[in-house]
Amino acid sequence: MTIEIPPTQGVLLAGGLARRMGGGDKPMRTIGGSTILERVIARLKPQCDGIILNANGDPGRFAMFGLTVVADNVPDFPGPLAGILAALDWTATNRPGVEWVLSAAADCPFLPRDLVMRLHQGRAEEKAQLAVAVSGEQSHPVIGLWHVGLREELRRALVKDDIRKIDRWTACYRLAAVSWPTEPLDPFFNANTVEDIAEAERLAALDGG
């Protein structure tokens, strides 16, 4: 099935506290001479109609990347759903006419070059309201497509229902799960630990650098 890809705003989620690396910003770690964040931006820029960064704290630390930084608008670091909500709110205000937001973890350096196209294709084929990425048998709910029209429902889920896990919220909707192969590498590998950074250096060669 071939569809026309609608305008899609990208958001890179970097709001986590990076406890497994002793604090700090995981996307600022370097792989093969480039930061992880540079790699993610380069991979998604051709696929999205603009990219913003969801991060908390001083936005100036990301100034070199030239992205608009949007903080959570729900307090106490409630997780990636808060970053997705912030992106939906920002898109509704600043990108009238754009109905879809792609979210991706800012510490996934090998994202697929067909991510946006295949997620849209999957949700269109299944007439779904949302779409998430899968590799092997592992779901990656942080990496998905979200309709701007669901933002008030998401806000209620976060603020009134205290829902924190993406899977718990998406269970309320028709969801398309779109799968990618894990060979020669898992495109949704993310750098959570110092050991993961070393593994990412090896995988970068398989990904073309």
Swiss-Prot record:
It comes from Nitrobacter hamburgensis (strain DSM 10229 / NCIMB 13809 / X14). Pfam families: NTP_transf_3 (PF12804). The lineage of its organism: Bacteria, Pseudomonadati, Pseudomonadota, Alphaproteobacteria, Hyphomicrobiales. It catalyses: Mo-molybdopterin + GTP + H(+) = Mo-molybdopterin guanine dinucleotide + diphosphate. Mg(2+) binds at D107. Transfers a GMP moiety from GTP to Mo-molybdopterin (Mo-MPT) cofactor (Moco or molybdenum cofactor) to form Mo-molybdopterin guanine dinucleotide (Mo-MGD) cofactor. The keyword Hydrolase does not apply. Its EC number is 2.7.7.77. Keywords: Cytoplasm, GTP-binding, Magnesium, Metal-binding, Molybdenum cofactor biosynthesis, Nucleotide-binding, Transferase. The keyword Nucleotidyltransferase does not apply. GO terms for cellular component: cytoplasm. It comes from the Bacteria. It is found in: Cytoplasm. The N-terminal domain determines nucleotide recognition and specific binding, while the C-terminal domain determines the specific binding to the target protein. GO terms for molecular function: GTP binding; metal ion binding; molybdenum cofactor guanylyltransferase activity. SUPFAM superfamilies: Nucleotide-diphospho-sugar transferases. HAMAP family: MobA. This is Molybdenum cofactor guanylyltransferase. The gene is mobA. Monomer. Its cofactor is Mg(2+). GO terms for biological process: bis(molybdopterin guanine dinucleotide)molybdenum biosynthetic process. Its main location: cytoplasm.
